[in-house]
Amino acid sequence: MIEIFLAERCPFCVKVRVFMEQKGIPYVLKPVVLGGATSVVKEELIRLGGKAQVPYLVDPERSVRMYESDDIIAYIEEHYVR
């Protein structure tokens, strides 16, 4: 299942979250708190992507990882929206 790292007040994250919910695409939410103390989820984000930037998508079924809300939405649109 797709995992998406999102921060609560990030407008780009809201854009991805709203898109996923409108399209009914299931995903695992990985909540990230930016600017605060390092958390296990934030450490995982940095380990996987190399930086603490959100939104960040991980699709283990296709071995795809990416940043950038527009790229994430285009990817989901191409591979998961029916």
Predicted regions and their residues:
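GST-like domain detector, emphasizing the conserved glutathione-binding G-site
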Residues: 1-8, 14-82
